[in-house]
């Protein structure tokens, strides 16, 4: 092996050290009182163990892109959890209030059967309601087409689907929909992305207004089936 191989190894080691230091500094911010006790304990344990998991969980932010976001569930800035989902929903709420100033806003929320999908859905409803936005929350798991239908049926301005499609079980995801029942497209996609990027943990409104959270289910189920039959989809 020549000097080139030695240089490559040294460069990689240096890069790995930089990532580790970056991840450690970012992880330490999650030990503040802005995060719940269980999260702080999990982060401290990761720091104490000095594991590769710490680097992967904190070296970057979980990206919210045109297709929403998708990632491994767990604590960290690069994971699906209460705070990354909270930030995404707060950003969506901020954007909706910009787009529909002074008007009543509602959002339909549904999920698939993945681990934590129902918990994450509830989190979305709580953040939206805390922002004065009505949340229509399905009473259980539903297929994506029905959630898309419900957005139009209930005349909502947006929708959220908690799903990671074909990814392995440790993943989950977050997809934003617009009032036409389809995933957000320009200019709304970039508008939401920009708003989400500006959200800090202290900006997230977690305290729900239960009066703005409405459970939906059988009525929408029936309307969905009837519409599918009427239009020849069944």
What is each of the regions a protein language model found here?
Residues 1-7:
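Short, small-residue-biased leader/transition segments that mark boundaries at the very start
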Residues 19, 30-31, 102-179:
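Ferredoxin-reductase
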Residues 30, 34, 53-58, 62, ...:
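Gly/Ser/Thr-enriched, mixed-charge loops and adjacent short helices
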Residues 63-79, 103-108, 126-130, 199-219, ...:
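Gly-rich Lys/Arg/Thr-decorated short loops/hinges at beta-loop-alpha junctions or inter-strand turns
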Residues 80-90, 116-117, 139, 143, ...:
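Phosphate/oxyanion-binding active-site loops and adjacent basic polyanion-contact surfaces
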Residues 89-107, 231-234:
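Glycine-rich phosphate/diphosphate-binding loops that line cofactor/substrate pockets in enzymes
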